[in-house]
Amino acid sequence: MARILNIEIPSNKRVVISLTYILGIGKSLSKEIIVKANEKLAKAKEKTFTEDSRVKDLSEEQLQAIRDSAKTYLTEGDLRREVSLNIKRLMEIKCYRGIRHRKGLPVRGQVTQKNARTRKGPRKTVAGKKGK
């Protein structure tokens, strides 16, 4: 297993797929990283690789080029911290989205009269009136 951005990525998979094991890197960003790494390798007159190459077949120079290209993006812990700080900021300024976060309700305008059980949690039963 190769180590990129302190994450062990699977060696037997294609490079494009392996990079998606890192939080914050999807398929399109993975392809972008590979293009940048290949440009860097071409400048240094090293052997380039394709998206279909397996991680286990890459040389140390190629892996280092991928590491350097991936460093420029916000990933893993830094990304988690950024997202949590954004949510905290919304709650502090008491905007509509922040209030929805604080109350544990859907934030993006979904209807909540009958649905949104995942966000609201299990039903809280209310006792009916006794002795009509």
From Swiss-Prot:
Residues 106-132 are annotated as: Disordered. GO terms for cellular component: cytosol; small ribosomal subunit. InterPro entries: Rbsml_uS13_C, Ribosomal_uS13, Ribosomal_uS13-like_H2TH, Ribosomal_uS13_bac-type, Ribosomal_uS13_CS. The keyword 4Fe-4S does not apply. GO terms for biological process: translation. Part of the 30S ribosomal subunit. Forms a loose heterodimer with protein S19. Forms two bridges to the 50S subunit in the 70S ribosome. This is Small ribosomal subunit protein uS13. It comes from Mycoplasmopsis pulmonis (strain UAB CTIP) (Mycoplasma pulmonis).
